A protein has these predicted regions:
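Juxtamembrane intracellular "pre-TM" segments in multi-pass secondary transporters
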Residues: 14-20, 207-241
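Hydrophobic core of transmembrane alpha-helices in multi-pass small-molecule transporters
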Residues: 31, 99, 113-134, 325-340
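Short amphipathic helix-loop junctions that connect adjacent transmembrane helices
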Residues: 42-56, 255-271
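Helix-to-loop junctions at the C-terminal end of transmembrane segments
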Residues: 73-84, 286-299, 384
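C-terminal ends and interior cores of transmembrane alpha-helices
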Residues: 94-115, 310-322
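Cytoplasmic helix-loop-helix junction between adjacent transmembrane helices
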Residues: 125-164
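A membrane-interface helix-boundary motif in multi-pass transporters
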Residues: 179-193, 382-402
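C-terminal transmembrane helical hairpin of 12-TM major facilitator-type secondary transporters
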Residues: 301-345
Length: 423
């Protein structure tokens, strides 16, 4: 790992211009990472099938990314508390570039002669990109470093907007560029190029936010459970549980929705992509702008609660979305709920830690989210397997998970309203 001193910033963070530059670069870091992830959504499974991957292996190929994020988010977050945010972000971008290049090499004529070797390369590359994608928590900690607590909801909303935009642009880029005369590897080269360019931009212009005197020591063992124990006196365990349940419920829905919309509603892949784009656009509008205006110090838990309730209702109503107008209304409500809940939970989490533990705190949040994204598709698939054709069962189970998140969020509310920052 590169030392923080070697990657020190060339200008201080005290100026507004420096902060605006940092906000933009972190936004681009998250956006490019999500575009790189989204590019793979429509093409990874058929790409892996070329090398003999079964449906279950393809599912693991998708899930292992989130699993690596789960294990390494707290680790990278804690390392960023020790050596600084900047070196972790830059090294992760370079690692992501290498991971995408490895995936592209699976199409190499020499390697592709051995399907098992190519498949092994794909798994190795997904492990690398998953580990490097765990730096999302460091990006959140970076923003928390330079943002006053009462303004963090708006900044976390900006990160949510990058998520939404990445999920809109990624699948579109992947679908369009994979079907060209350049071959199916082109999307992976594009993702690698975007990661490299962003790494260069960050190297040149991203300042460090954590001076040496404020850095903590790296603990020998970092884990989500350990972080929860150290912060058990705050509302962090309830925030962490809420985050896990919200993301898992949403992941159950997305995994089931693609199959349900295709088989039951007879939508094409293009139409399904447009529906997810519709969700993403609403997320951009809310998390990129509206959340800044409505989130105030002390009301974040109320917004998270309202968003979670909206998601419970929308998930429960989703099976009645055979009529397009109803479906659009339900999905709009779901996107609004998710866009209110996610950034406010991250804001609440950021207030639980000290300056020295922001990376570890946000790393635990990111890791819990990754675990939710790992389990969600498998739970959705398991429900569809034991109840064939009963897609509503998966949606209703997701609503149950979301209702559990509502209960968890209610445990946060009194602490925040009382005026504590969770400390």
């Amino acid at each position: 790992m590169v030392g923080g001193a070697e990657l020190s910033a060339s200008f201080p963070m005290s100026s507004d211009r420096s902060k605006h530059t940092a906000h933009l670069l972190i936004f681009l870091t998250v956006l490019i990472d999500l575009i790189g992830f989204g590019i793979l959504i429509p093409i990874l499974q058929p790409f892996a099938a070329k090398f003999g991957a079964s449906d279950m292996q393809a599912m693991w190929l998708m899930g292992i990314y989130s699993l690596m994020q789960f294990f390494f988010s707290p680790v990278l977050g804690r390392w960023s508390d020790r050596i600084g945010r900047r070196p972790v972000i830059i090294a992760s971008l370079v690692g992501s570039m290498l991971g995408y290049l490895i995936i592209a090499q699976a199409e190499n004529p020499v390697l592709s002669m051995n399907g098992k070797l190519s498949l092994l390369l794909l798994f190795a590359a997904r492990v690398v990109t998953g580990i490097c994608g765990a730096s999302f928590s460091t990006a959140q900690a970076y923003l928390a470093d330079i943002t006053a607590p009462e303004k963090r909801a708006g900044v976390m909303g900006m990160i949510g907007a990058a998520f939404g935009l990445g999920f809109v642009l990624g699948p579109v880029i992947g679908g369009l560029t994979s079907d060209t005369r350049f071959g199916p590897s082109l999307p992976f080269y594009i993702a690698a190029a975007m990661s490299l360019l962003n790494a260069l931009f960050c190297w040149k212009s991203l300042p460090e936010t954590l001076p040496p005197e404020k850095r903590g020591e790296v603990r020998a063992k970092v884990s989500i459970l350990g972080t929860m124990r150290r912060m058990g006196h705050t509302h962090f365990p309830a925030v962490l549980l809420s985050n896990f349940l919200v993301i898992m419920a949403f992941s159950v829905m997305t995994a089931t929705f693609v199959i349900w919309a295709g088989k039951e509603l007879h939508y094409s892949q293009r139409q399904i992509g447009l529906l997810f784009g519709f969700i993403g656009i609403i997320a951009i509008l809310i998390q990129g702008g509206l959340i800044r205006r409505i989130a105030k110090n002390g009301n974040e838990a109320k917004l998270a609660l309202g968003g979670a309730v909206a998601m419970v209702v929308s998930l429960a109503l989703l099976p009645w979305g055979a009529v397009l107008s109803v479906l659009l209304g339900v999905m709009a409500l779901m996107s609004v709920g998710n866009s209110l809940t996610t950034p406010t939970l991250n804001t609440l989490a950021s207030r639980c830690g000290t300056v020295q533990t922001q990376g570890e705190t946000m790393g635990a949040m990111s890791g819990a989210g990754s675990l939710g994204r790992f389990f969600g598709p498998f739970i959705g698939g398991w429900v569809m397997e034991i109840a064939p054709g009963r897609y509503e069962c998966a949606f209703w189970l997701a609503a149950v998970f979301m209702a559990a998140a509502v209960v968890a969020i209610l445990r946060i509310r009194p602490v925040v309203v009382a005026g504590a920052d969770g400390k």
